[in-house]
Amino acid sequence: MAKQVKFSEDAPRSMLRGVETLPNAVKVTLGPKGRNVVLEKKFGSPLITNDGVTIPKEIELEDAYENMGAQLVKEVATKTNGIAGDGTTTATVLAAAMIREGLKNVAAGANPMVIRRGMEKAVGAAVEEIKSIAKPVENKSSIAQVAAISADDQEVGNLIAEAMEKVGKDGVITVEESKGFVTELEVVEGMQFDRGYASPYMITDTDKMEAVLNNPFILITDKKISNIQEVLPVLEQVVQSGKPLLIIAEDVEGEALATLVVNKLRGTFTAVAVKAPGFGDRRKAMLQDIAALTGGEVITEELGLDLKSTKLEQLGRAGKIVVTKENTTVVEGAGDKANIESRVAQIRQQIEDTTSDFDREKLQERLAKLAGGVAVIKVGAATETELKEKKLRIEDALNSTRAAVEEGIVPGGGTTLINAIKAVEGVKVEGEEAVGVHIVLRSLEEPVRQIAANAGLEGSVIVERLKKEPVGIGFNAATEEYVNMLEAGIVDAAKVTRSALSNAASVAAMFLTTEAVIADKPEENKAPMGMPDMGGMGGMGMM
């Protein structure tokens, strides 16, 4: 396909229209008085959202050059979301401001490579200032503040804070859609995996349809058990102890399953069989996790262990086990703390080393089950449209909260970026590098200007006032007052603010140093050929 190429001033100018279009759609959502954006869906109801990464994903422009500009800014939002999970709107607004200011200076004859160096120095100083302003998150109320600001909902803030308190920072918190109207929190204590009982005859509580085992022994193996003779020796030892038994195996079937069920129905002893969780190597790792948690051994031929010669000492123990049709929950595992901590450290190292997002997610789940727990926020709403919008907000708030726990909190509402201006002004540069510093200085004001504009106020007046105020004093657009942002609970995660600024500057610098743009030449749609006159057939000629 033929290409068209644009050089020098034409190249960035044609992309600038796309750079402006995308932020214009996103920036209206910024701040407490930000608006929503409606996204068309080919199937189902439209999506109403104020999420700064969902909106850019939907934008594709017809003109190839404009679309390239829009996609560059989209990358800022996506990268910021990937690192910090929030701050996408701020990052988009910052990137557009830097590109706009930068192009003015490049058009006036400034050298883009020198401007870039100045921008990098300025952003470096601003990032260090953000880190120095950051305060660690020390209590539940601070976590609730971060989540409430991100979700624009105090109730959601409290739910996320409660979830984090219960499962710890290593715990997994997931967001699911509820069937009701109320948003609620469900916490699973202990280790839970998604495998249920092998036979419904094993249940002990017919009302709840679950098997509850108190203080049981746990046989853990990666083998398939079909012959009862294989496990008879260990079964006899368990029966003599008078305790119930949980068998976790690749599968329990045939004669072995029938014998367990018959003995349960006769009341001889209680044994529940469940399939091992996961598949392949992940299954082996999860069985080792269960063994560490319960203080047992995985009976596997790889270690030279045989089911027939298994002793009671090799079985795991737990305070309580609840088995439903779909899940098994191990509560109060009797494993040695040092072994569990060693296992946790090993999984943490694997999380750091892996390059696969899928593997990282699965490792994070295993870590949570060993070290923390699992909490589920079930989102309720009156309509499907509201449910989707609410779920997106809660996911953003959750990401922002995790980032806050990691690197601390800073004053919100764009205040920290204004506070960083003094540090940037102190950067020593020569020649045209000063232009790069000026571009960053001007863009640091942009989020506050936009928050004010969305509230129907004049941003310049507020920016000038904030520059004179002490660090931490900001503008609360919801009440239109100047307040101590930390005391008022208007906070952002330091990681979110830092990532937004760094990613915006990175893409802006790349944009400004672009000298040529290549795009596919649009195809001309040829008019469809008309039908020929069908002469010879009386009355059938075309009029």
Swiss-Prot record:
<comment type="function">
    <text>Together with its co-chaperonin GroES, plays an essential role in assisting protein folding. The GroEL-GroES system forms a nano-cage that allows encapsulation of the non-native substrate proteins and provides a physical environment optimized to promote and accelerate protein folding.</text>
</comment>
<comment type="subunit">
    <text>Forms a cylinder of 14 subunits composed of two heptameric rings stacked back-to-back. Interacts with the co-chaperonin GroES.</text>
</comment>
<keyword id="KW-0143">Chaperone</keyword>
<dbReference type="InterPro" id="IPR027413">
    <property type="entry name" value="GROEL-like_equatorial_sf"/>
</dbReference>
<keyword id="KW-0067">ATP-binding</keyword>
<dbReference type="GO" id="GO:0016853">
    <property type="term" value="F:isomerase activity"/>
</dbReference>
<keyword id="KW-0963">Cytoplasm</keyword>
<dbReference type="GO" id="GO:0140662">
    <property type="term" value="F:ATP-dependent protein folding chaperone"/>
</dbReference>
<dbReference type="InterPro" id="IPR002423">
    <property type="entry name" value="Cpn60/GroEL/TCP-1"/>
</dbReference>
<keyword id="KW-0547">Nucleotide-binding</keyword>
<feature type="binding site">
    <location>
        <position position="413"/>
    </location>
    <ligand>
        <name>ATP</name>
    </ligand>
</feature>
<keyword id="KW-0413">Isomerase</keyword>
<dbReference type="InterPro" id="IPR027409">
    <property type="entry name" value="GroEL-like_apical_dom_sf"/>
</dbReference>
<dbReference type="Pfam" id="PF00118">
    <property type="entry name" value="Cpn60_TCP1"/>
</dbReference>
<dbReference type="InterPro" id="IPR001844">
    <property type="entry name" value="Cpn60/GroEL"/>
</dbReference>
<dbReference type="InterPro" id="IPR018370">
    <property type="entry name" value="Chaperonin_Cpn60_CS"/>
</dbReference>
<dbReference type="GO" id="GO:0005737">
    <property type="term" value="C:cytoplasm"/>
</dbReference>
<dbReference type="GO" id="GO:0005524">
    <property type="term" value="F:ATP binding"/>
</dbReference>
<feature type="binding site">
    <location>
        <begin position="29"/>
        <end position="32"/>
    </location>
    <ligand>
        <name>ATP</name>
    </ligand>
</feature>
<comment type="similarity">
    <text>Belongs to the chaperonin (HSP60) family.</text>
</comment>
<dbReference type="GO" id="GO:0051082">
    <property type="term" value="F:unfolded protein binding"/>
</dbReference>
<protein>
    <recommendedName>
        <fullName>Chaperonin GroEL</fullName>
        <ecNumber>5.6.1.7</ecNumber>
    </recommendedName>
</protein>
<dbReference type="GO" id="GO:0042026">
    <property type="term" value="P:protein refolding"/>
</dbReference>
<feature type="binding site">
    <location>
        <begin position="86"/>
        <end position="90"/>
    </location>
    <ligand>
        <name>ATP</name>
    </ligand>
</feature>
<feature type="binding site">
    <location>
        <begin position="476"/>
        <end position="478"/>
    </location>
    <ligand>
        <name>ATP</name>
    </ligand>
</feature>
<dbReference type="InterPro" id="IPR027410">
    <property type="entry name" value="TCP-1-like_intermed_sf"/>
</dbReference>
<feature type="binding site">
    <location>
        <position position="492"/>
    </location>
    <ligand>
        <name>ATP</name>
    </ligand>
</feature>
